[in-house]
């Protein structure tokens, strides 16, 4: 189950173009559920996760949240607490977590950006989670790979996003 925000929900893309749809195609022997929601913060995800876990009963949760927390300037400590609770909830439901990290545009300042990114790496290390440090790895500064808003990757970036996740996910699934 992919549990994320607009980057995983396929914001601004045609149906079937998003990285989660491409992941589903790459793993035909597995059921890939997209429980992502555009605009989702970690607080919103925390409130939605229990129902999603109960409904879908996933073996793996790909947790891709926090970008909207950062874009709103919310405290990284709050984001970390919410992510920690979601990891714990997932573990309680017997699901393994693959954590997906984010980065912020530089206009948020170096200190905030560093604290924001450290949430992911610290949590992955502390909880020994499989980890994709940056969903937009390899094209984060390439404006041609983003929609007009400069935040959401366009269709040309989706395979690379899928591949970043798949590289780590393959070690978690049996094919």
Protein language model annotation of sequence segments:
Residues 22-26, 47-175:
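Alpha-helical cap/lid subdomain in secreted, periplasmic
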Residues 1-41, 48-57:
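Serine-esterase "nucleophile elbow" of acetyl-processing enzymes
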């Amino acid at each position: 189950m992919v549990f994320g925000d607009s980057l995983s929900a396929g914001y601004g893309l045609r149906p079937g173009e998003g990285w989660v749809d491409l992941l589903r195609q790459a793993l035909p022997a597995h059921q890939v559920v997209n429980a992502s929601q555009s605009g989702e913060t970690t607080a919103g995800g925390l409130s939605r996760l229990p129902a999603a876990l109960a409904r879908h009963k996933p073996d793996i949760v790909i947790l891709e949240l926090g970008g909207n927390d950062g874009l709103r300037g919310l405290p990284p400590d709050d984001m970390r607490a919410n992510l920690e609770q979601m990891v714990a909830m997932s573990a309680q439901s017997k699901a393994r977590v693959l954590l997906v990290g984010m980065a912020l545009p530089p206009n948020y300042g170096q200190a905030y950006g560093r604290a924001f990114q450290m949430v992911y790496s610290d949590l992955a290390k502390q909880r020994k989670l499989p980890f994709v440090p940056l969903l937009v790895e390899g094209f984060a500064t390439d404006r041609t790979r983003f929609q007009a808003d400069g935040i959401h990757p366009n269709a040309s970036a989706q395979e690379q996003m899928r591949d970043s996740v798949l590289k780590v996910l393959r070690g978690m699934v049996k094919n």
